[in-house]
Design a protein with these regions (language model features):
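Active-site-adjacent structural elements that line small-molecule/cofactor binding pockets in enzymes
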Residues: 1-297
Length: 297
């Protein structure tokens, strides 16, 4: 969707009772600019990067951008940070994807200091630090990053989580008072088409090393190893054919909106505090789905 058309949609989201809007950063726009538009067309919504990585922007630039976002949103901005993946960091941007846990830790420590008005490493100091602390949420898939998020961040943001594994993530995070968000891909439409789309998306993610390790950690290694081997061997069609259908159905929201809402309620009951919806549909369908998932339909 063109950014100049985003404003009315943001107003609709706010009027429908949603708590926040989250902006991803992958192959489309950067993670911050859509939130600037959202800030201008909302009064209450939290505006969250979900996520920007700690490699492709230096820490001083991240601090400057976070401060600007806090300013333009009147304190509603939440900085979602993460290590991302070797694909985005190294393959697309030419930056070594090294020491992700240490890099995230160092970046958060730096940002906490600089956003509070102190000097960071190298002597950088913000001329206009935010009036209030900027909350930080960390992208976290496996145990070490989940525990790091529990220790140094205001919340954790996970992804591609099967319902049967929510308890494992909640137990590892072990911070009942902090936000535990999860992104959900909602794919409406005929079930066969939706399942095919979900399967292709699953394979594209599951074959990225950080997600391969994530699914192994969750206990699904035996299910995904054949498709990962096929993908790495160059047979992508076979990889899609080998995708475990039951696992795909556990992760993605398929079918009518009411059925998808019921699935989200199950995740909430299991311990997910914030459901971040990624709606896979033509732009013309967005208003209907926004209303369908609304907190106050």
């Amino acid at each position: 969707m063109p950014l100049h058309e985003l404003g009315p949609l943001v107003r609709r989201i706010e009027d429908a009772g949603y708590d926040s809007v989250w902006s991803a950063e992958s192959t489309d726009f950067d993670g911050f600019t859509p939130l600037v538009v959202a800030a201008e067309h909302s009064e209450r919504l939290r505006l969250v990067t979900g996520i920007v990585n700690v490699y492709t922007r230096g820490p001083a630039l991240l601090a400057q951008t976070a401060a600007a976002m806090a300013n333009v949103s009147n304190g509603r901005f939440v900085l979602g940070l993460g290590a991302s993946s070797n694909v985005i960091v190294e393959r697309w941007n030419g930056i070594p994807f090294e020491r992700p846990l240490a890099k995230v830790t160092e970046t958060v420590d730096y940002l906490r200091a600089v956003l509070a008005g102190d000097r960071g490493a190298g002597g950088f100091k913000l001329a206009s630090p935010p009036a209030e602390p900027v909350p930080i949420v960390l992208a976290a898939l496996r145990d070490r990053m989940l525990r790091l998020a529990a220790r140094i961040a205001d919340g954790a943001f996970t992804n591609f989580l099967p319902l049967s594994n929510v308890a494992q993530v909640v137990h590892t995070f072990d911070m009942p008072g902090k936000e535990l968000a999860c992104r959900f891909f909602s794919i409406p439409g005929p079930e066969d088409e939706a399942l095919a789309t979900a399967t292709r998306t699953f394979v594209a993610y599951a074959t990225v090393p950080v997600y391969t390790e994530f699914f192994r950690w969750l206990g699904h290694g035996d299910e995904i190893e054949p498709l990962v081997d096929a993908w790495n061997g160059g047979d992508r069609k076979r990889a899609v054919e080998l995708a475990p259908e039951q696992l795909v159905r556990e992760i993605f929201l398929l079918g009518p909106v009411e059925a998808q809402r019921e699935r989200l309620a199950e995740f909430a009951d299991a311990g997910i505090t914030t459901a971040v919806l990624a709606l896979s549909c033509p732009p013309a369908e967005l208003p209907r789905l926004i209303d369908g998932f609304a907190v106050r339909p």
